From Swiss-Prot:
<dbReference type="InterPro" id="IPR012340">
    <property type="entry name" value="NA-bd_OB-fold"/>
</dbReference>
<dbReference type="InterPro" id="IPR004365">
    <property type="entry name" value="NA-bd_OB_tRNA"/>
</dbReference>
<feature type="zinc finger region" description="C4-type">
    <location>
        <begin position="678"/>
        <end position="696"/>
    </location>
</feature>
<dbReference type="InterPro" id="IPR013955">
    <property type="entry name" value="Rep_factor-A_C"/>
</dbReference>
<keyword id="KW-0238">DNA-binding</keyword>
<feature type="DNA-binding region" description="OB 1">
    <location>
        <begin position="81"/>
        <end position="140"/>
    </location>
</feature>
<keyword id="KW-0235">DNA replication</keyword>
<dbReference type="GO" id="GO:0000724">
    <property type="term" value="P:double-strand break repair via homologous recombination"/>
</dbReference>
<dbReference type="GO" id="GO:0003677">
    <property type="term" value="F:DNA binding"/>
</dbReference>
<dbReference type="GO" id="GO:0006260">
    <property type="term" value="P:DNA replication"/>
</dbReference>
<dbReference type="Pfam" id="PF01336">
    <property type="entry name" value="tRNA_anti-codon"/>
</dbReference>
<comment type="subunit">
    <text>Probably binds DNA polymerase PolB. Binds helicase Hel308, in presence and absence of DNA.</text>
</comment>
<feature type="DNA-binding region" description="OB 2">
    <location>
        <begin position="192"/>
        <end position="273"/>
    </location>
</feature>
<keyword id="KW-0862">Zinc</keyword>
<dbReference type="GO" id="GO:0008270">
    <property type="term" value="F:zinc ion binding"/>
</dbReference>
<dbReference type="InterPro" id="IPR051231">
    <property type="entry name" value="SOSS-B"/>
</dbReference>
<keyword id="KW-0227">DNA damage</keyword>
Length: 792
C-alpha cells in the first residue's frame, strides 16, 4: 500500500482491516469505470468518506475471519474470549522495577478447540470473586500475547470485564472435574488436588542460587491416608500470611506439583496452584508432646518448655569451606531440663530467656560430654515461640516464667556463692575503654563497667567479645548468665563467653529509672570541705585547677598501670586526686568543670601533715559537668583568687600554703640541675658497681630523673629561697626533662645548661606554692606548685 493511501487508512483503521480497505478501493474503481480525473488517492478518500458516513461490516466480523474460539486467537488482537474455567491460581505478589508492589493470578479457560491462560493483573484481581472453577465466562477487552513455549496468553487490561454465562449454552465445552487424590496415593506425576489439614508451618527460610537469594516455606499436611510436605517458593511465601494459614487449618490445594525427595513424594506450589482454606472432612490433628523428663534417644519429637538460658551463636567452617553457625539454649518443664542445639538460620531466631518455646520435628541424642539427653534441631524442625494455647503445660510454664525475673542489684550484692549465674537489668553507669592483656593462650580483652538500678550499682568485668560490644553510658541493658565474683570491697559480676548482653524486654523497663533519676538516687553531692575519709557514693562538682602528665608504673603482679595527679577545687576548698588507668587518660584541661562520681576518699600522711585525697579508678566516673551542675560553681579565675591568696614575700612563714607570690628571679643556679633517683624507692641514687641501689637494694635498669632549679625570688618587701622541681622546672626552663638528660649525657657535663639557667635571672614570675623551712640552710624556702605567669 502506497504511503498516501496508508494515511487515508489511518482514519478508519479501527473499522476495517487493510485488506478490506484495498478491496473496497478496487470495487470503487470498477463502479466508477474509466474516469481519468480520479486517481487512487481520490478514490481512497471517497471510500473513507463513505465508511465514515455509514456503518460498515468489518472483515474481522465475517464468519471466516471471526476470532470466536481459542484456536482462532491471533497474537496482537484485542478481543473477547470465552471458555470454561479449569484452573484458578492463588494471587501472587511481585515488585516492579520501580519498587511498586503488584499482584497477578493465572486462570486457565478452555473451549472445544483448546486451552488458554488468562493473566489477571492488580486491577483485575477483584474480578476473581465473580466466578469459580467450572463456570463458563466471557472476558472482554483482553490482549492476546505470545506466552511461554509459544503458547498464546490473554492479558487483561484495566478496562477488562468478566461475565458469567449459562453453561447450558456451551455443551461442547470440556467438563470441569475436581478429582481429589489421597495423600497416601501420591506419585510423581502431573498436578494433583488434595484436601488436608495443616499440622505444622515452618519459618520462612532462605537459600542462594546463582548468586541470588530466594525464600521458601513448608507446610506439613495430613489426611486420613498419610502425610507429606507442601512447599511454597519466593513470592508465593506471602500466601501463608495473606490467607492466615496456621497449624490445625483444613485446606484444599488445587493443581499442586508432586515431586520426589528422599524417597518421599512432596507437593510444590506452582504458578497455577490454588489454596482454598475451608471446613473440610479431614481428621483433626493433635500433636503429642513429650515431657523433657521422658526424653530418650528418639526421632521426630515435639517438646515444649521454658527457655532458661540462651547462649550467643558461634560460627564455624564446614568441610566445604562455607560458614555455619550453632547456638544452644536450655529449656525446662515440670519434669526436667535439656539443652537444645540450633543450626544456621535457626540461630537467628530472636529467642529470649523466659520465652515459652515449642519444638516440633527434632531428634533427641545422648550427649556424652554432659552425660544427658540433648535436643537437636534439623532442616525440617518447626520452632514456635510463645504458642497461644497448649493446655495445662502452658499454664505451668507461665507460672515458672514469673519466677525467672532478673534480680535487683541490691539482692546480688548480698550473695555469697562465687560462680553462681544471675540475670540483671540496669543502666550503664560508668564504662571504661577496652584494654588488652596477655594470657597463656594469647591476647585477651577486658573492659569494666558499672550497672545501676533503683536499688544500687555493681561493677561488671566484660571479657573478650563482650568487651567489644558497642555500649554507651546511660544505655539500658539486660545481662544474662553473669557469674558472681567476690571482689576486694564488694560483690562483682563477670561477663564471659556464656554471658549474653541484650536489649531489655518491655517488662524490664517498667520500673527502671532514667539515667538522670539514677544519678540523683545513688549519689550524694558533697562540697570538698565536707568530705570525710571513706566516703562512698558521693558526687563532687569542681574545676580542674592543677594537672600533671600521666605516668606509667608497674603493679605488684607485674602488669603495667597508668596514674595521673590532678587537683580539683570548688567554692569551699581544693583536693588532690590520683586518676588511675582509664581515668588517667580522660581528656582534661586546667579550668575544666567536671563531675566526679563515686571516688574513694582516702587519708594520706606520706609527706607529713595528713590530708584527704581522691582516688578515681575503674569504679569511679569523671565526666564534663553539665550546665545544671555549674550552678554555684565559681569560674576558674574566681577560684584562683579564693584558693591562692596573694602574699608579699616578707609575709611568708612555714604555714604559708597554696599562696601566690610574684617577684623577680635572682641567683639562679644551673650547675647541678638533675637529680638521679631510684625508680623503686625514689631516693637519691648512689649506685654500687653492680647498678644496685644502695638504699633499697633493687637492681636499677633505668634511673628516674628529677629536674630541680634552685635560686631566689624577690619583690618590694623582701626575698626568699625558691626551688623549682619537675614540671615547674620544665616550665620556666622551657625544656623537658628528657631533653635536659640528653644534653647532659651527650656533653658529659652536669653544668651544660648553666648559661641557660642563669638567663632566668631578672625574669618576673607569678607562682603558686607552699613555704617551708629548708633543713640544710635553716632558711625559709618557697616550693612552687604551679607557674602561673612568666615574663621578662
Amino acid at each position: 500500500m502506497k504511503e498516501e493511501l496508508k494515511r487515508e487508512y489511518e482514519r478508519i483503521k479501527d473499522r476495517i482491516s487493510p485488506e478490506e480497505f484495498e478491496e473496497l478501493i478496487e470495487k470503487k474503481k470498477e463502479e466508477l469505470g474509466d474516469i481519468g480525473f480520479m486517481d487512487d488517492l481520490t478514490i481512497a478518500s471517497t471510500v473513507v468518506d463513505d465508511i465514515l458516513k455509514e456503518k460498515n461490516t468489518m472483515l474481522s466480523e465475517k464468519p471466516e475471519h471471526r476470532m470466536d474460539t481459542i484456536s482462532k486467537l491471533e497474537e496482537g488482537a484485542e478481543t473477547p474470549v470465552t471458555g470454561r474455567v479449569m484452573k484458578i491460581s492463588s494471587p501472587r505478589t511481585f515488585t516492579t522495577r520501580k519498587g511498586r508492589e503488584g499482584k497477578l493470578a493465572n486462570v486457565i479457560i478452555a473451549d472445544d478447540t483448546g486451552e488458554l491462560r488468562a493473566v489477571f493483573w492488580t486491577e483485575n484481581i477483584k474480578l476473581l470473586k465473580k466466578f469459580r472453577e467450572g463456570d463458563v465466562i466471557r472476558i472482554k477487552d483482553v490482549n492476546i500475547r505470545g506466552g511461554f513455549g509459544g503458547r498464546k496468553e490473554a492479558h487483561l487490561m484495566p478496562r477488562s470485564t468478566v461475565e458469567v454465562l449459562d453453561p447450558e449454552d456451551y455443551p461442547e465445552f470440556p467438563e470441569y472435574r475436581e478429582e481429589i487424590t489421597p495423600i497416601g496415593d501420591l506419585v510423581e506425576d502431573d498436578e494433583v488436588n488434595v484436601i488436608a489439614r495443616i499440622t505444622g508451618v515452618s519459618r520462612v527460610r532462605t537459600f542462594e542460587r546463582d548468586g541470588r537469594e530466594g525464600r521458601f516455606i513448608s507446610l506439613d499436611i495430613m489426611d486420613a491416608t498419610g502425610s507429606t510436605t507442601y512447599t511454597l517458593w519466593n513470592n508465593d511465601v506471602n500466601l501463608v500470611e495473606e490467607l492466615g494459614l496456621k497449624e490445625g487449618d483444613a485446606v484444599k490445594i488445587l493443581w499442586a506439583q508432586p515431586r520426589r525427595r528422599d524417597d518421599k513424594v512432596t507437593l510444590t506450589h506452582t504458578s497455577l496452584t490454588r489454596v482454598v482454606p475451608g471446613e473440610y472432612d479431614v481428621p483433626e490433628f493433635r500433636e503429642e508432646l513429650v515431657k523433657i523428663g521422658d526424653l530418650h534417644e528418639m526421632r521426630n519429637v515435639t517438646v515444649m518448655g521454658l527457655v532458661t538460658k540462651v547462649n550467643d551463636p558461634v560460627e564455624f567452617e564446614r568441610n566445604d569451606g562455607t560458614t555455619g553457625s550453632v547456638k544452644s539454649i536450655e529449656i525446662a518443664d515440670d519434669t526436667g531440663s535439656a539443652r537444645v542445639t540450633l543450626w544456621d538460620e535457626d540461630t537467628r531466631i530472636k529467642i529470649n530467656k523466659g520465652d515459652i518455646i515449642r519444638i516440633s520435628g527434632a531428634n533427641v541424642e545422648f550427649d556424652d560430654f554432659n552425660q544427658s539427653y540433648r535436643i537437636n534441631t534439623n532442616f525440617n524442625t518447626r520452632i514456635t515461640l510463645n504458642p497461644e494455647s497448649d493446655g495445662a503445660l502452658l499454664k505451668v510454664l507461665e507460672e515458672y516464667r514469673e519466677q525467672m525475673r532478673p534480680m535487683k542489684i541490691s539482692e546480688i550484692l548480698e550473695m555469697e556463692d562465687e560462680g553462681e549465674e544471675v540475670d540483671v537489668v540496669g543502666r550503664i553507669f560508668s564504662l571504661s575503654d577496652p584494654r588488652e592483656f596477655e594470657r597463656e593462650d594469647g591476647t585477651g580483652i577486658v573492659r569494666s563497667m558499672e550497672l545501676a538500678d533503683e536499688t544500687g550499682k555493681i561493677r561488671i568485668s566484660l571479657w573478650d567479645e563482650k568487651a567489644e560490644k558497642p555500649m554507651n553510658i546511660g544505655d539500658a541493658v539486660r545481662i544474662e548468665n553473669a557469674r558472681i565474683r567476690l571482689g576486694l570491697y564488694s560483690v562483682e559480676l563477670s561477663a564471659g563467653r556464656t554471658t549474653r548482653i541484650v536489649n531489655p524486654l518491655p517488662e524490664d523497663m517498667e520500673d527502671l529509672p532514667s539515667f538522670e533519676e539514677l544519678e540523683e538516687m545513688l549519689y550524694q553531692t558533697k562540697k570538698i570541705a565536707d568530705l570525710e575519709e571513706d566516703d562512698r557514693n558521693i558526687r563532687i562538682i569542681a574545676r580542674v585547677v592543677d594537672l600533671f602528665e600521666p605516668r606509667e608504673f608497674q603493679r605488684g603482679d607485674g602488669t603495667p598501670g597508668l596514674v595521673r595527679t590532678a587537683e580539683f577545687a570548688d567554692d569551699t576548698g581544693s583536693i588532690r586526686a590520683s586518676l588511675w588507668d582509664d581515668a588517667a587518660e580522660k581528656p582534661l584541661s586546667i579550668g575544666d568543670p567536671v563531675k566526679i562520681e563515686n571516688p574513694r576518699v582516702v587519708f594520706r600522711d606520706d609527706m607529713g601533715g595528713g590530708r584527704l585525697e581522691l582516688s578515681i579508678g575503674n569504679s569511679s566516673r569523671i565526666e564534663p559537668a553539665s550546665e545544671r551542675d555549674l550552678e554555684g560553681l565559681p569560674s576558674f579565675d574566681e577560684l584562683q583568687e579564693m584558693l591562692y591568696p596573694h602574699r608579699d614575700i616578707a609575709d611568708l612563714d612555714e604555714d604559708s600554703r597554696n599562696v601566690l607570690i610574684e617577684g623577680e628571679l635572682i641567683e639562679m643556679s644551673g650547675r647541678r640541675i638533675l637529680s638521679i633517683k631510684c625508680p623503686s624507692c625514689n631516693e637519691r641514687l648512689d649506685l654500687s658497681d653492680e647498678n644496685i641501689c644502695n638504699f633499697c637494694g633493687e637492681l636499677v635498669d633505668e634511673p628516674r630523673y628529677l629536674l630541680m632549679i634552685p635560686g631566689r625570688i624577690m619583690d618590694d618587701t623582701g626575698e626568699v629561697m625558691i626551688t623549682f622541681f619537675g614540671r615547674e622546672a620544665e616550665s620556666i626552663l622551657e625544656m623537658t626533662t628528657d631533653e635536659v638528660v640528653n644534653i647532659i649525657n651527650q656533653s658529659a657535663d652536669e653544668s651544660a645548661l648553666e648559661e641557660r639557667v642563669e638567663d632566668l635571672n631578672g625574669v618576673t614570675v607569678r607562682v603558686i606554692g607552699n613555704a617551708d623551712m629548708d633543713v640544710y640552710s635553716e632558711e625559709l624556702r618557697f616550693i612552687p606548685r604551679k607557674v602561673v605567669k612568666k615574663e621578662l
